[in-house]
Amino acid sequence: MAMTVHCDIVSAEGEIFSGLVEMVVAHGELGDLGIALGHAPLITNLKPGPIRLIKQGGEAEVFYISGGFLEVQPNMVKVLADTVQRAADLDEASAQEAVKAAEKALNEKGADFDYGSAAARLAEAAAQLRTVQQIRKKFGG
């Protein structure tokens, strides 16, 4: 039997996942992180993108988060996310439209233009689209 760690994924809407996993793979502020049992304690920011859980038996489950924090303790991993969606629920066409809308907003700067907000919307939409495309490429869906 593989060694596991307890993982919780929570957002403002509530608990999204709680269970034992062999590994958690997330996109941290300084790059990708792979967390397994025995990982050193850690708290880090998470960028928008996929969170991949490798469950017991090797089954993978993927979620999209819009950002948040990751806390690692000796027997527990906790993801505190701004928003979470199961990757299977993401729609590629909607993600592409969001990228186009964000790019258009960046190109059509008005008097009250907020560059930081527009850039954040573009980064989130692009991360969501990347997540959908990665899943389609890996699982052929």
Curated annotation (Swiss-Prot):
The keyword Transmembrane helix does not apply. It is a peripheral membrane protein. It is found in: Cell inner membrane. GO terms for cellular component: plasma membrane; proton-transporting ATP synthase complex. Its main location: membrane. NCBIfam families: ATP_synt_epsi (TIGR01216), PRK00571.1-4 (NF001847). Produces ATP from ADP in the presence of a proton gradient across the membrane. This is ATP synthase epsilon chain.
